Structure formats: C-alpha cells, structure tokens
Amino acid sequence: MKKKVLAMLLAFAMTFSLAACGSSGGDKKQASSDATEESGTDEDAIPENEITGDPSAKDAFVIWAWNTDFTTLQDLLVKKYPDLKDRLVFVNCGGSSYYQDKIDALLEDPGNELYPDMMLLEVGYVQKYVQSDYLMSLKDLGITDADTADQFSYNIELGSDKDGVQKASFWQATPGCIQIRADLAEKYLGTTDQAELEKMFSNWDSILEAARKVNDASGGKVKLFSGYDDLKYIFLNGARTVGWYDDNDVIQMDPAMEEYMEYSKTLYDEDLTFNTTMWGTDWAALKDGDGEKSEACIAFAGCPWYTYWSLTDTWDKNTILVDAPVQFYWGDTGLAATAKCADKDVAAEIIKSCTCDKDFMTSIYKANGDFVNNQKAISDIVANSVKGASTFSLYGDQNIPEFFSTRGQNVDVSLVTAEDMTINETLFPAAVTAYATGKSDMDTAIKDFKAAVHDTYSYLKVE
C-alpha cells in the first residue's frame, strides 16, 4: 500500500498541472481550445507564496490553501478564539494548479517552518491524502462521530479512508443541479414552470429533444447547453456505477461513461451546442447573450457556489433550478490536520468550529454565502430565512438553500478514488473529445484512454 501511495503522489506531481488545461471541444468548433489558450497561465511562472503571519514564531500554526477563501473563516475564528490572532499563519500558494506540488514537498519536510499544521483539501484530490499517512484522524483530535453527525454523509465518506477513518472534514456541501435562464426558457421552451422544466430535464432523451427544439427555433443562435463539456460532472459525479478500476487494479470503463461519449457525439454531430469548454471566455460570454444580436444558452450545470457566485447579473431573479437526470455533486472544500501538526488542540478547535458547530457554520453562510455541510444549520437557515453574503436570488419563489437542502442527502461517492481528479479533468475528457469530434472511433478512444491512465498510474493495469 505504501508503494502504491508513493507512486500515486509521483503521478500527481507529474500530471496535476495538466488538469488546468483541460480538453477542447473539437475542430470545427475550435473556440474552446482557443479560449483555453487565452485564459491559461504560464506553467513556468510559479507564483510566490503569499504568507500572512509569522511562520518563525515559536507557537505559529500554519494553514495552507490555494486561494484566500479561508480568510473569511479565519476572521470568524479569531473572533471566537482571540488567542489565535497572532498564532495563525495563512499561506496562499497562488493557485490550485500549484497547490499539490508545493504541499507534497513540505509534507516530506516536517522541520520546515512552513510545514502545514492544517491544510485545505478540494474534493477532487482529497482521497489522495486521506488514503496516505500524511493526515491525522478526527478521532486523534478528539472529534467524535457525534460531532460530525449533522454533516451530509457523502462528505463524511469523501473524507474517510478505506477503513472508514475520517481524516478530512468539509465545511461546504455542493449537491448539483441544472440552472435555467427563465426569460430564454419562456421564449424557446414555452414555460417557466419549474415542474414542467423538471420533466424536460428528467432524462437524457427529453433533454436532447429540448436541445433540438431550441436550436431549430433560434436558428442556432441559442443552444440549450454551451457544450458537452458542461455535462461532464453530471455523468462523472452522478451516473457512474463502477469505478475507474476494479479490486485487482484493472482499468475499466463504466457503461455510463460510454453513454456520455455517445451523447457528446450526438450533440456535436447535430451542432446542438456551441462546443465550449467550461471556464473559457466564449463559454462565459454565453451567459449574457440575448439570443438575437449575440449567442446565448439556456442552461448550465451548477451547484450552490456556482449559483451564488458564477452566474451573472443577467441571471439574477431570472434563474430556475431543477434536478439533473441523476443526482451529482460538484466541489467541496474541507480541512485536515497533518500527522505532524504542532498543536492538536488548535486543530480540533478549528475543525469543530468550521465543520461541526451549527451556529458557527451559520455564521459562515452569513459571511460568504457557502452552502454549509451541516444539515441542522441549513434547516435553520431555510426556516428563519437567514440572509447570506450573496444577494443573488432565483426566479419566482424558489429559494437557493431550500432547493439544495435535500439534494445533498442523495449524493453517492462510493466510487471516488485518489486518481479521480486527473482522470476526470484531463484523461477522460480527452477521450470524450476524440470520439465526439470523430478523431477516433469508440474502441480506439477507450483503448487510448486506458493506455493514458496506465501511463499516468503505472500500478493500474490494462487487460
């Protein structure tokens, strides 16, 4: 097991920077790859760490992250525990593309003054660290099952190792949805009624029918979805029935993933999307198009943080949330204390406050709008109409926390592995694009995909 973990860490070090590049949507619709190039960063320009606090102080407690989101929580913590004000050292590594490489080196160097006592973890790679010896269990910190009882169960599973020992604890929950622009839905789908839209988006056949209807009615100026890439998390984080490899470490292809490849090809061949890649400039521009003078799309896959912070003003009071054909999740950020954490008591205070304490987690929602990983807190937020940091609101009488409050109970993460981030973000999308755009047939695309997975993770086998 130790050899496998070391091999996995090496594979991540070599491939993680590729994940930021993603895969483009194809040839005739080349805008997605162009947007990636425009929005990409120079991989050689590794940013300096931004450090707040004094890491050389004898009682310094060092927390690592890839952005500044945690500073809102840190401000709340300092109010609750004033003694932490001069002790906490916050390190922002400068971006998620650099986080793992930087922190992996420090995890092997506990004598370094920047060694993390606590580290933030994204859901995409949390299992990489949870399955290693680099993290301390919550029970070692004195945090019990009773403390985490109100967390969504899928987040507990994501933060636990193969033996069910929880090492990471999430303050966010991110069940997925489909976000529909009401004005365009009324014009091209003929309704803004949530129940009717739920039916349209309840299965992939009816979604395809709606996509054709929108495309024909708008003369191609409006599409239902921006690109097949926009559907990937629904399939990857909701539709799978088998993992990327079996108990014998043999790489396998889930039938649901083949279905996604076929679905993507249909969308591409029939020109039913703009073939954009998520986060590209062309993808972003479609949110504000009017469908006449400028191109637009009606729906985006989403989740709480996306709804609050990634939709534009065009969508404010103009967004209807519905379920996808399968329940999925997208994101989550959590906390973990490292094995050589300098102060277990401080680590316990932070993790219990940020991920277990109903009242404190409600204050997080008020401060930054996060849909928190505490079912009692969410129930109180809904019942008492608690105002969060975001002023974004939905169409009609829909309520964001209320909509998502029950969706997190149905998320299945039993197939998540430590390798998922690289496979899901880089290797599999390349296979989807190769097949959808006609560069490879299905058998070749799958064969090349399996070979790429093996090349990245040599301990995974192709048969």
Task: For each feature predicted by the language model, list its residue ranges.
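Extracytoplasmic/periplasmic substrate-recognition and gating elements
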Residues: 108, 312-377, 430
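Extracytoplasmic ligand-binding clamshell segments of periplasmic binding protein
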Residues: 98-101, 239-324
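C-terminal capping/gating helix-and-loop segments adjacent to ligand/active sites or protein-protein/ligand interfaces
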Residues: 392-455
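Helix-loop-helix "hinge/cap" segment bordering the ligand-binding cleft or interdomain interface
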Residues: 139-146, 157-231, 244-278, 339-345, ...
